[in-house]
């Protein structure tokens, strides 16, 4: 079962496996959401309150103290918080998916990718709920949204898939080298400041112009989708160059193909004997 299928068919195989087990995935998503929100008094409202409070705090620290004058800055930060949180949670959650669920693998032949996908989809649900936190900002600042806002979910899907794909590459090795989980979590914390959460794409281009540093910055896989989210919601135009989209597209497909291949090839071997 684990070695006869061609490694090159891994992306298609994993997609098919998860479609076949979609009922289980729904139950896992419900389990994760209930575990997080059933106890607290405010329940699912925390999915809105948390990014809202974070955006207000970050806006105060970076906006008032540093001196940002953009009246839409809190909304800009809110979008960055939602996008980055989805990517970071998908990355760190997938990285430890094998170690977190190792006890289940001893008793079932369920494809291991099911747990990674259910975690990613749970993060999607939370991110879509978090978007409602933007409504007060849009009303307060009188921002009129147009039909381009329907593209926002595709940006979120891209962020979650990239984070999950990179996590799939690391997850099998994190079973035998647990320090990798801590390293990834550290990188995620540092990456927050290196990503357009509290700063914007125009700030990046204004700082580095069109030089090599600016081009290399597009290797950060969240820059393009978060910037596009802001453009779609706020009606702005950040002027991302064609090579920026090309670099993100390359990173997206490369990480997805490599992630599914590595996970399909290594996950079972690494888990055996735990």
Q: How would you label these PLM feature ranges?
A:
Residues 1-274:
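Hydrophobic transmembrane alpha-helices and immediately adjacent juxtamembrane helices
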């Amino acid at each position: 079962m684990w070695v006869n299928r061609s490694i090159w068919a891994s992306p298609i195989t994993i997609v098919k496996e998860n479609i076949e087990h979609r009922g289980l995935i729904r139950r896992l998503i419900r389990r994760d959401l209930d575990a997080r929100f059933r106890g607290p008094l405010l329940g699912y409202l925390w999915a809105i309150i948390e990014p809202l409070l974070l955006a207000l705090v970050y806006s105060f620290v970076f906006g008032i103290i540093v001196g940002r004058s953009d009246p839409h800055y809190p909304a800009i930060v809110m979008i960055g918080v939602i996008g980055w949180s989805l990517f970071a949670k998908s990355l760190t959650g997938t990285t430890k998916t094998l170690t977190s669920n190792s006890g289940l693998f001893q008793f079932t032949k369920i494809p291991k990718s099911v747990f990674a996908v259910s975690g990613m989809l749970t993060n999607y649900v939370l991110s879509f709920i978090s978007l409602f936190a933007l409504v007060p900002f849009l009303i307060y600042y009188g921002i009129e949204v147009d039909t381009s806002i329907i593209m926002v979910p595709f940006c979120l899907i891209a962020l979650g898939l990239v984070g999950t794909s990179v996590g799939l590459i690391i997850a099998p090795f994190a079973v035998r080298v647990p320090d990798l989980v801590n390293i990834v979590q550290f990188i995620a914390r540092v990456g927050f400041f290196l990503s357009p959460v509290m700063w914007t794409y125009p700030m990046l281009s204004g700082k580095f112009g069109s030089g090599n540093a600016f081009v290399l910055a597009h290797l950060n896989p969240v820059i393009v989708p978060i910037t596009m989210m802001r453009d779609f919601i706020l009606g702005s135009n950040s002027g991302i160059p064609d090579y920026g989209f090309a670099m993100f597209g390359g990173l997206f497909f490369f990480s997805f193909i490599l992630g599914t291949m590595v996970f399909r090839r290594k996950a079972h071997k690494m888990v055996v004997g735990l």
